[in-house]
Amino acid sequence: MPVGSVKTLTLGSHGDTMVPVPSASSVDGKPLTEVLSEAEIEPLVTRTRNGGGEVVALLKTGSAYYAPSAAAARMARAVAEDTGQVMPVCAWVDGEYGIAGVYLGVEAEIGAGGVKKIVERDLTESELAGLREAAGAVRAKQADVASL
């Protein structure tokens, strides 16, 4: 299957509390949940959370910098050209998804000046719970740093 026919979304933080969003994913324009069963999706969610380590292991030297570099280039273009493109970014969350006071990976409209607005999706209960768990993990890390 061509990579370009698969569209996915991941929110939250990086690592164990990463939140792959199957409800916002598609294959050839069809919702992922219509293409694969829950039993087929769950291992993909787990592999996505652990994917950074897999990429680093395959590269043997260096790190998993290709995707972040491509994303940074897309963001820079969106800011420079004031496109208003919606993309996943790390942004200050202030009430969206019932979460406030933390930087978190969410979808946002990007243009001149950076984040214009956070775009909230309708998440499933488990996706929303995962996003809230990610926010808690980020807050805990912030508290660790603040205590230094």
Question: Where would I find each of the regions flagged by the language model?
Answer:
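C-terminal substrate-binding/catalytic lobe of Rossmann-fold NAD(P)-dependent dehydrogenases
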Residues: 1-148
